[in-house]
Structure formats: structure tokens, C-alpha cells
């Protein structure tokens, strides 16, 4: 029955309600359960995956949401927390070319899957741009590695991440990256619109615009032009299934077809969720 919350197994067990069974909800639920929480996920739709849906037409399956598998080390890290290697759960195929750019009123461009060939492409379009791309990607890699080591896996519950010697040594660069928008950062180095488009599109992944995105995120060019773009066989539904499997193995409960309309609270703390039919 919609709105019926499972009875906790123990009064001493901490509980958590996760709203939404997209990538973030599934991963959060699995991690909370791993920490000992009794977790229930509430999802308005009748399937998990959120925006990572798929449709079938004439026997062909199509991803309706994400279609690029980037930052493989982040996925590797997550799966390893639960004792899995990524290759045990997913069959990933490197894409070459990584993707195809369709500039307005110009011929399409195939973007190579490695930095050396990408530099050759840049040079063929704009003399001098090949060497500039190599420098750009070197900076992107350094920034990416710094973010991975000190920022990606921290809760920022203390300023410790900002006080690490490596981070302090890069304060000047970080200040520049945080105060210069991505479009201006790229425009200072490249003139051709197509090259700028290749390097500023990551702002889309942040639901932003290059003019409003800090150039810190030029680190994203490391993920597609250096690490390369991968695609999971079976589509992104396969990635959803892998994380969903882990969450269930951790004991997470799922309430599909259940819409949360409000979070109740008292004294500054969340106390429950209000469902579309009744209040739990």
C-alpha cells in the first residue's frame, strides 16, 4: 500500500530516508547502509535510475539520459568500497573517436580518444593550438589529481582539506581558477569557435554555462581528452543496475511509485517524510 513505511528492525538502529532513486540516491543509500543505517529509498517513478532511463524502438534500445561514462576512477572507488572491481559489474568499451562535434554551418569534427591526436586536430584547425592544448591538458590533469586527492571524497566538515601542503602551495592557481570563468579562460588560449566549444562544453555537465562556470572545471577536459570516453554495454541502465544491486545487497529498502511531498522537521532536525497519500 502506498505510504506504508516498513517497521524499523531495531529501535537503536539509525534510520535514513532517501528521496529519489537516481544515481545520487542509489549511491547515497548504499553508502549509508554500509555505515549501519536502516535505509528506505522513496521513488516517485516505478523504476530506479532517475534521468538514466531507456526506451526501446523497433528492437533497439536508446539511453534517454546520460551517455558518457567519465571519471572511471570515481566509479572504481565507489565499487571498491563494497568489495567489487568495476570489470566484475560492467563491460566498458572505450570510444574512438570519443565523440563527434557538429559545429553550426561547418563540417562535423571527430574528436580523437587520446591527447596526442587531439593536439594534432587542434593544430590542423588553428596553428599553434596543438602545443597550447598540451599545456591546457597538463594543467587539467594537475587540477583533476589535486581535486581527487583532497576534495572529491571529503565532507568538508573541517578545513583540513584546504590546509594540506599541496593545496596551500597551489592557492594562487586556485584563486585564479575560481575567479576566472571557463569561457574567458579558454578564449585566452584558443581563437577558433570549434576548439572553444570542445573545451567549454563540460559546463553542461554542471547544469551551468561557460560564462558562469569557474575555470577550475577545465579539469573536466582531462576526463574526455586524456582519460577517454567509455560506454557501458547494455547502456547506462547497466550502471544503474550495478549500483541498485549493491544497495539491495546492503539491505536498502525501496518504495517505488511513492511520491514524497514534504520533509517534516522539529527543532532543526528532520523527523520524517510526508507521502502523497498519508503522513508517516
Locations of regions flagged by a protein language model:
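A short, basic/flexible loop-to-alpha-helix module at the beginning of a structural domain
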Residues: 3-14
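Rossmann-like flavin
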Residues: 104-213
